[in-house]
Amino acid sequence: MTESGFRPTGTPDLAVAKSHNDFAMLEPREQLATLLKEHVVGRPFSELAAVTFDHRAATVMGHVLIDALEDAGYSIDDFDAVGALTAASVPMVSAMIQAAASRGEDLDGFVMDFVYPSIKGPSIEGRRVVLLDAWLSEKSYVQTSSLVTLRNGNELSLDFGIVEQLGAKV
């Protein structure tokens, strides 16, 4: 029975289409929150790859991240490049590049390489950068675990050292 009291009718594929349409009607932040709940709830620690590589997240993730930066008082004009700290955060970087482009803004991306401490991507020398990570634990929030702006002396000093050595401003 449904909420209306009637028995559902139609083929099973219609129910799937309805649930997809319900998801599409959500605001972008709500879509991302729904995906996070599906993949993270009940897990004490998650890399978020199941979310960042999901096709539904790919369409909204970049805009949500840029909006989160703006909500924190930053403008897209405050940074020149965005970098991925882990493999799971690479789609986040790509999504931000595409979201910025759709807004008429230029934003480059890069990936941190920890095998040979360096970056992969356009030069970040003299550029202002934001680093992204895609880890979530019960004791953190999405905004603080997935959006990391490095400062001198924090726990990511290796990452900061590589970026600083390449002449970027974090």
Located regions from the model:
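PRPP-associated nucleotide enzymes
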Residues: 1-170
